[in-house]
Amino acid sequence: MSIEAPTQAPKPSVTLAEAAGRKAMRRLLPFLLLMYVLAFLDRANIGFAQKALLHDTGLSDAAFAFGAGVFFVGYALFEVPSNLALHRVGARIWMCRIMVTWGLISAAMAWVQSPTSFYVLRFLLGVAEAGFFPGIIYYLTQWFPQSSRARAIGVFYFGAPLAFIFGGPLSGLLLEMHGTFGLAGWKWLFLVEGGLASAVGVWAFWYLVDKPEDARWLSPDERRALTSAIQLDAREAAAHGPRDALAALFDRRVLAYAGIYALIQMSVYGVIFFLPQQVASLMGASVGLKVGLLAAVPWLCAVALTWIVPRRADRLGGHRAWAARLLVMSGVGIAVSGLAGGLGGTAGAIVAMLGLCCAASGFIAAQPLFWTFPARDLAGAASASGIALINSLGGLGGFVAPMLRAAADRNFASHAAGLELLGLASIAAALLILVVAPRAVAPAARSFEPPVRRAR
């Protein structure tokens, strides 16, 4: 006579997988967050250095906009090869390589003397950093199942606002070191922030663990439970998504997500690259510590919303609807910041800052939700190449955004025109998400069983 196992048997494995996931969050996410903070600092520090850099090197506004964007050309060209290399050699080795090389190139920005050297170093910085962001997203899919993935990516995304909360004042202080040891403040900015990236890259080699089954800080049962949960997601993704790295590059869903992400990145970088100067204009001050502190306010709002929304979506579902709402809010906020800033006076400045708070909160909090959509359709090498392609093509939005904003302002003789255009891009992304993204992501209610050992 056979005895059936109780129907509630999977519950302990659910608890075990969740416990292992919480351990992984505590162990990995603070370090990944630090890495992303440094990545964002190295991308956006030219926004703080802009005025002094242009003054000392003679670059024009158009040359600066092109140089700010050419980063994304190198980034896009080498994104997919870089992520496939990470899939092959592991995050520990590849993230070390990425961070050390981009830190050295960022520090070399201190020796920019002409438009040509500016373009070359910005392009090389993109090449060096290629694969960092999609590599981390792919890495998180190897550590966290779908039921907790938005929360994990959401914590990682804190890096963007935190880079401005702490990076704004830090950049302001470094700029005020002008003349120390005979170096201009903007040179100190690149040297210090680039050096920090290289140092953390070396640390990453010793700290990161490639896969749950290699984590000594998890018990054997926890390793099995977490690995089982992730493998279940991978099998489901492989069943209806592209089966290999090459197929993912031509998959219609992947290309559609890349188009959506490009629109999101247009709004993100069209704001980020000019935010310090926009805040300085509202204050009637030059970029420094005070401007850095005020420029941190929108990112404080972004941290709060990014903490709340992905957790709510993982618990209750509705990733698609939340992402669309946040991007509409962001688009309206971007446009309002430009229109109100042109009114002048204290009231106009306050409304413009509120608009920037809505803009930053919306486009930062929406992105962890966005990345759960392609992750449900991709697994293995297809996941590595597909995520890289989305980020690569999407990053081109960051390339064109500064130039589109500058061109719109110039052609319409209005500093609000470019921001209105970027706001429309964010709203268009929201509408496309409603068309392309899956209608629902089930709340975290799945069971994961570790492999069952046969009785001997």
Predicted stretch roles:
Residues 121-158:
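Cytoplasmic helix-loop-helix junction between adjacent transmembrane helices
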Residues 319-373:
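C-terminal transmembrane helical hairpin of 12-TM major facilitator-type secondary transporters
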